[in-house]
Amino acid sequence: MMMKTTAPKTVNTAAKRPQSRGVAETLIPRELIARQVGGRLALDFCNTAGEHLADRPDESLRDWESFLRWATQVGLIGPESYFELLHHTEPVVPIVRLRDAIYRVGLAIADKRRISERDVALLRDHANARRPEIEARNHAVRWKPAPRHASEQLSAVLAGEALSLLCSPQAVRIGICEGGLCGWLFLDESRGKRRRWCDMNDCGSRAKARRYYEKHKEL
């Protein structure tokens, strides 16, 4: 979040409103785990693997810290929870398995293919697990997972988010990026479902450059 700069003025410091970005947030590594282009949290979760259609996708959730950083960046947990949970490392493999199951279901819907009952069962089992407590801090309401059960509880939230989308009429609007092996999913809310790319500044731009090259190569 960008900080406003204002001209110096005399104020009553006791009446100042707290800054929106606390010290804890400024200490979190700033490297972006994945861009938020899916339009829904569950789809952004799916997009934490690059080149998702490749035999070996580019994994962004490499460890517990990278998952916590992503969860903070998308607003799933607050900065304070990031540091609290960082000291209670959990395996990231079950989280990645859940993500991949959500992705396969979303991909099947986008491609109009048969959905795996095994994947749906995995989503259901995670969604039925206990969810975190909720806390209100400053001007936000966030999940507050128990340190020793954070993986299970956050997985329950993500699975619930996924099922809320996949079981809704909006599921038919799930699209897949046409940028080669990208495979990122998004909710196509355009008129006539004409969206083709995860991001026009990324895969869309490369496709445009490729068309330009092919056109002028023939001249």
Task: Give the residues covered by each predicted segment.
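Short helix-coil boundary/hinge micro-motifs
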Residues: M1-I176, G183
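BZIP DNA-binding basic region
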Residues: Q153-Y213, K217-L219
